[in-house]
Amino acid sequence: MKKWQLVGTTVLGASVLLGACGGGDSSGSGSGDGKDLKGEAKGEGSSTVAPIVEKLNEKWAKDHPNATISSGQAGTGAGFEKFIAGETDFSQASRPIKDEEKQKLEDKDIKYKEFKIAQDGVTVAVNKDNDFVKELSKDQLKKIYNGEAKTWKDVNSSWPDKKIKAFSPNSSHGTYDFFEEEVMDKEDIKAEKNGDTNVIVQSVEKNKEGIGYFGYNFYEQNKDKLKEVKIKDDKGKTTEPTKKTIKDGSYALSRPLFLYVKEKSLKDNDVMREFIKFTLEDKGKSAEDAGYVASPEKTYKDELKDLKKYDKKSDK
């Protein structure tokens, strides 16, 4: 059985070696069939997307013992920084690439391809003993996270006059960017921030007046310790995050999850190209195994069709 191995830790997060053990120079060779495939593809980015990549790799490594996928989970922003710097073949992202990131890639003449590999719902949760917060509107969430609401009573006059303890990912995370865009209208988030999502979960669990937000699978893994909060959308409809509401988009904080891959790596690195093909042919099963939601089947079909142009056989 393959094991995930910690190969390096930075102030941004842990880098995890996925798949077969062994070296590699971020290049790949071989026919693309199982044991003939040799080399490595390197990635970095979202801790939300990381569990999906790990699940994919558990399957991949069984038939590709000499093809290594190495990836970290330092956050979407940190992942794009390495992607732009030329240090990685792919970047995991829990938000779309920003215009300024696109420009930096364009300035370096780095072309890339976007793949939507799954769907997620950013989940808001409070302490398990909180018996009064059952739902929140986006406006109420904004008041909590911009510091306007200091106590629960400031959010709802019928709630206790107790100081709120708000927790958030830090700005290196795509979940932070998504929340800032969808909830905060780009206002600054005023909360205790952490780069480790597990620490945020633990903080909400330990603080009776705690509130936090994170990817759906982090809630799913800890739902015996936390209480989810239903979200009221702009039309006044209240919905809880479930696989169904995330898939049909009725949950107000639904979002796609991405892999961004350099076109050069798709053309020149057999390991990278075959892993992306493997990911799309998996049709979101690994995403479901990781606690997320598969993209519509048409998404995978269309992306597989687009991927064919990078196949070396198609150049002959």
UniProtKB/Swiss-Prot annotation:
Residues 1-20 form the signal peptide. Keywords: Cell membrane, Lipoprotein, Membrane, Palmitate, Phosphate transport, Signal, Transport. Residues 23-49 are annotated as: Disordered. SUPFAM superfamilies: Periplasmic binding protein-like II (SSF53850). The keyword Lipoprotein applies. A lipid is attached at residue 21 (S-diacylglycerol cysteine). One of its GO terms (molecular function) is phosphate ion binding. InterPro entries: PBP_domain, Phos-bd, Phosphate_ABC_transporter. Residues 23-32 have a biased composition (Gly residues). One of its GO terms (biological process) is phosphate ion transport. Belongs to the PstS family. Part of the ABC transporter complex PstSACB involved in phosphate import. The complex is composed of two ATP-binding proteins (PstB), two transmembrane proteins (PstC and PstA) and a solute-binding protein (PstS). NCBIfam families: ptsS_2 (TIGR02136). This is Phosphate-binding protein PstS. It comes from Staphylococcus haemolyticus (strain JCSC1435). The lineage of its organism: Bacteria, Bacillati, Bacillota, Bacilli, Bacillales.
